[in-house]
Design a protein with these regions (language model features):
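Single conserved hydrophobic/aromatic residue that forms the stacking wall/gate
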Residues: 1-12
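Broad gene-expression machinery/nucleic-acid interaction feature
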Residues: 13-17, 77, 187
Length: 248
């Protein structure tokens, strides 16, 4: 009997990766500044915008929350990721459907969908989910892959393991027998990059902003501090998604 699970929980979670630029001449303790940024983000997470059905993550508000923490902060580059938890039926054949309710950003090279690790029947090595976009950029194949540590290559274990609908924001994993998960409680975290940084929880999706799994990198603004007025050597942070296989 093949079971079909529509979602594993009715919750979509935001997280951010933020590079916070600061003027080092105005900061005595960088760790304290980082803590203050984290606390400010947690306060926003607890606000009326979020942690509810139909919630909305407001990107511009998050940028302002970070910038307003301290006058030493000069700017921030913040990337948004969304995830849902897939609770696997261990050692049982099952199909899984994860609805994010937000359109996905599509890089034609793939790696738009990422996951934490798991194992499947007849494959002892840790595997991951990823996507192979179709030429139309609207849909793609969901693939199960594994990294080859010796060569740095990614090997396809199952090339057609399901479907990704980038427009609807859906990930469908067809009949698969999962034997274990790297995370506790049989959980596989499945991540995507939203097309819009304003993320909306549809009426049947509970939206949370997970600050605990967000990344805050403090970066010295060498132009503002006067160290490198010309801008040569200034550390630039990309605003776009990366091509890594695993969910970070």
């Amino acid at each position: 009997i093949v079971q079909c699970l529509v979602g594993s929980e009715m919750c979509i979670r935001d997280r951010v990766d933020s590079s916070v630029y600061f003027n080092s001449s105005q900061v005595t303790n960088v760790d304290n500044l980082k803590t203050n940024v984290s606390n400010a983000l947690q306060s926003y997470s607890d606000s009326v915008d979020l942690s509810k059905f139909g919630g909305r993550f407001k990107y511009s508000k998050v940028l302002n929350v970070i910038d307003d923490v301290d006058r030493a902060i000069t700017s921030n580059i913040t990337r948004v990721r969304i995830r849902r938890n897939l609770r696997a039926l261990i050692n049982q054949e099952a199909q899984y459907e994860l609805c994010f309710g937000n359109r996905f950003h599509v890089n034609s090279a793939g790696f738009n969908i990422k996951s934490t690790g798991f194992t499947i029947i007849n494959e002892p090595d840790i595997c991951y989910l990823t996507d192979i976009p179709n030429a139309d950029g609207r849909t793609g194949a969901l693939a199960i892959v594994k990294p080859i540590e010796e060569t740095g290559e990614t090997r396809i274990v199952i090339g057609s393991a399901g479907l990704v609908d980038y427009i609807k924001g859906e990930v469908i994993l067809t009949t698969t027998l999962i034997t274990s998960t790297v995370l506790n409680d049989d959980i596989i975290e499945v991540q995507a990059f939203p097309e819009s940084n304003d993320v909306v929880g549809l009426k049947d999706l509970y939206l949370e902003f997970d600050v605990s799994k967000s990344t805050i990198n403090m970066v010295k603004d060498t132009i503002s501090s006067g160290e490198k007025i010309s801008g040569v050597g200034f550390k630039v942070t990309s605003s776009y998604s990366n091509g890594e296989l695993k969910r970070g």
